[in-house]
Regions:
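N-terminal Rossmann-like NAD(P) cofactor-binding subdomain of oxidoreductases
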Residues: 1-161
Length: 161
């Protein structure tokens, strides 16, 4: 079993992640961190998970008990956390915020769009998950780019929410 921790567990993205992990045969959620909801049941916030879990939010961070840590935090918070906490060297991290999406010499996160970067994503220690608009645009344009069919300006109209 892959032992998972989640930071920023009260948001919409975290709710969907929790739902996916609860139904994953090889994942076990060890903790869901939310300082503002510590002690409350996850289903108090994510009502759609009622009957699926008895987990509660915690303000603790038992990083040494997990294999993978997901960040479902506001933009900027993942970077602050990484700079201010002693994160175990072997801990895999998947960031769902925008903090590490841009390639830089100051971090080792890889851009985690599997359709574009599958090999690197599978072996990476740190993965920066692309945002919804970037994913929409890239998945739509990658097949055209692969066949050299993008010859002019491109306009994308996308809606989220």
């Amino acid at each position: 079993m892959i032992k998972v921790g989640i930071i920023g567990g009260a948001g919409y993205t975290a709710g969907e992640l929790i739902r996916l992990l609860l139904n994953h045969p090889e994942a076990e959620i060890v903790f869901v961190n939310s300082s503002s909801n510590a002690g409350n049941k996850i289903t108090d916030v994510h009502e759609g998970l009622y009957g699926e879990t008895d987990l509660t939010f915690t303000d603790e961070l038992p990083l040494d008990e997990i294999d993978v840590l997901f960040f479902c935090t506001a933009h900027g918070d993942t970077r602050k956390f990484m700079e201010s906490h002693n994160v175990p060297e072997d801990l895999k991290i998947i960031d769902l915020s925008m903090d590490y999406r841009i390639k830089s010499d100051d971090h080792d996160f890889i851009y985690g769009l599997p359709e574009l970067n599958r090999r690197a994503t599978c072996t990476a220690k740190h993965v920066a998950n692309p945002g919804c608009f970037a994913t929409c645009i890239q998945l739509g344009l990658l097949p055209l780019a692969k066949h050299l069919m993008l010859n002019g300006d491109i306009m994308v109209n996308a809606i989220t929410g």
